[in-house]
Amino acid sequence: MIPVILLPGKLTTNSQGVRGDSFSTGRRYSEAVARAGGVVVQAQPIAQTTAAAHELVARFDGVIIQGGGDIDPNRYGQKPRSNAIYGISLEHDELEIAVIRAAIELDKPVLAICRGIQILNVALGGTLHQHLADVLADGESHWDKHHEINLEPNSRVAKAMKTVAPKQSHSFHHQAIDKLAPGLVVTGLAPDQTIEAVELNAKKWIVGVQWHPEDDADTEPDQQNLFNGFVDAIAR
């Protein structure tokens, strides 16, 4: 049986040939999963889908949470305090949090990418740095840059990628984890100590990464291996 992966979509207003707004998922996620032997199906961020999240997740083999705009700071007990915050969607937040919590309860494998690692942390009670430029000497070091990442040797992410120093790790974010949620363990750091990977060890395979492995997965084996490891976890 082909593993079928649920991926919550996001609202988009610029789809060619579609009248009005539409929902989208990134093509590169689907292609990376397909190379690993799975297939991606989108869940639309509307109230009816969120209300049925537990039943919906139960029908799938795993979950990917994709990158996107920022999470509403009210979700982690703060008010917006940076003009750099962008792309907040309450519906998007609600669906992803519901899907993450359902996946954890049902012990489904989860791969949470970029915004995904952030909302995984928020869903479990953690907080975020609202703008890295406010806390790092080089505030642009994670915005559309490739940089080194150091992984814990025995972590799920290192085992999946088959390395502790993955090549071509592309970051495109201005926020990151601040206070780590209970239960999560840090398994990867950037040279500036920004959290780059987390895992929920109490469950089957819950992994979050701050960079975008899908961006280079078609040419860089280290990055594709993360998707391979995710799909392999479904079979175990």
Regions found by a protein language model. Give the residues of each.
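DNA-recognition element of transcription regulators
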Residues: 172
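N-terminal beta1-alpha1 cap of cysteine-dependent amidohydrolase-like domains
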Residues: 1-111, 122, 129, 133-161, ...
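Alpha/beta catalytic cores of group-transfer enzymes, especially the acyltransferase/condensing modules
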Residues: 175
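Active-site-proximal beta-strand elements of phosphoester/diester hydrolases
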Residues: 207-210
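The feature captures the ABC ATPase H-loop/switch
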Residues: 117
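Conserved G/P- and acidic residue-centered "switch" motifs that form tight phosphate/ATP-binding loops
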Residues: 114
